[in-house]
Amino acid sequence: MKASLALLSLLTAFTSHSLKSPAVPPTVVQIQANTNLAIADGARQQIGSTLFYDPAYVQLTYPGGDVPQERGVCSDVVIRALRSQKVDLQKLVHEDMAKNFAEYPQKWKLKRPDSNIDHRRVPNLETWFTRHDK
């Protein structure tokens, strides 16, 4: 998962918040070490096709929802790269937030998880990766 951590550390370089210990033990997600190169390749494949920075709130299908390939933010690169290896961060983040909402940053004044946007927010991804020791 080193490639994912490298991608995430780039995304979170300017993000900080306090993390709490998990209230409910996180679900184990198996990602084999030999997929690291494939995940990095999934990110590389977006070069030239993801052309516009667009942080707009978009209603997405769930699970497996995504903004149009030509648009997105930095977290969408990570989401798509992992999805290329059958790892759906939208579903994983949403399920963990549904069980452990208080463990996630409360920057957006929400009262419950939102599967349309939560997985696209870097502080939420940072929390998820930390909670799942990735």
Residues of each region from the PLM?
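...with weaker cross-activation on analogous glycine-rich loops/strands in unrelated enzymes
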Residues: 35-40, 98-134
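Acidic helix-start/capping segments at beta-turn-to-alpha-helix junctions
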Residues: 54-75, 88-112
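Bacterial N-terminal signal peptides
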Residues: 4-13
